[in-house]
């Protein structure tokens, strides 16, 4: 395997960031150490928080609201405006949401929800028809998380082995769900809000 050091970054996560080791080098060339990095369209920071990624999401979605306004001024029907929102704006706010949906703060949730409220206000303004409403974004994210987690429960799923082993059926045969999986003990709030721990807690 050949590593292109010009395209390779090093990021220190967790407690190691407080006592950083010597810089990583490959073939005598030092790898750049960064505090944030965009991976497959998701901005990850060394504190494992989502302020930067949320800000980018909201900024990108807000820019697309401008075209929604232009379509509204051109007399496009409300149902077509809603279709534009669902296909052009909302996907931006839900991209890779499984990585962050259980970890973002209430303030970040409000920032994302504000974009949807603005879009619906534009769509419904000066409309003679009944106001159009959509499923709350938080509810949609949770639905996606539940669906993905259920896929992971299948033995054939490539992520199945990431989950804790099923509890002994004999010990749980009186429970509503006889195949409960233990929820890992979370010492930190960050780990408690991670996808798998959060999904397991909701599944029990």
Predicted regions: what they are:
Residues 160-161, 167-186, 190:
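C-terminal accessory extensions/subdomains outside the catalytic/core fold
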Residues 1-5, 9-12, 108-171, 195:
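Short, charged alpha-helical motifs in flexible N/C-terminal segments and linkers
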Residues 50, 57, 64, 85, ...:
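Alpha-helical interaction elements in eukaryotic regulators
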Residues 39-47, 61, 89, 93-101, ...:
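Short, conserved catalytic/metal-binding micro-motifs enriched in Asp/Glu and His
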């Amino acid at each position: 395997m050949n590593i292109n050091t010009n395209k390779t970054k090093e990021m220190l996560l967790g407690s190691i960031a407080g006592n950083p080791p010597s810089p990583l080098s490959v073939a005598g060339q030092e790898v750049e150490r960064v505090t944030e990095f965009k991976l497959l369209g998701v901005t990850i920071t060394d504190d494992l928080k989502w302020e930067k990624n949320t800000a980018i999401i909201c900024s990108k979605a807000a820019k697309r609201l401008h075209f929604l306004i232009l379509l509204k001024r051109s007399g496009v029907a409300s149902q077509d405006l809603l279709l534009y929102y669902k296909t052009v704006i909302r996907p931006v706010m839900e991209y890779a949401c499984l990585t962050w949906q259980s970890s973002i703060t209430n303030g970040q949730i409000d920032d994302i929800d504000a974009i949807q409220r603005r879009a619906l206000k534009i769509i419904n303004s000066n409309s003679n028809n009944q106001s159009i409403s959509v499923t709350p974004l938080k509810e949609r994210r949770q639905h996606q998380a539940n669906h993905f987690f259920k896929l992971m429960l299948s033995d054939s799923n490539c992520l199945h082995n990431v989950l804790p082993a099923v509890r002994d059926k004999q010990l749980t045969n009186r429970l509503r769900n006889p195949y409960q999986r233990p929820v890992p003990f979370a010492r930190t709030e960050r780990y408690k809000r991670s996808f798998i721990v959060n999904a397991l807690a909701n599944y029990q």
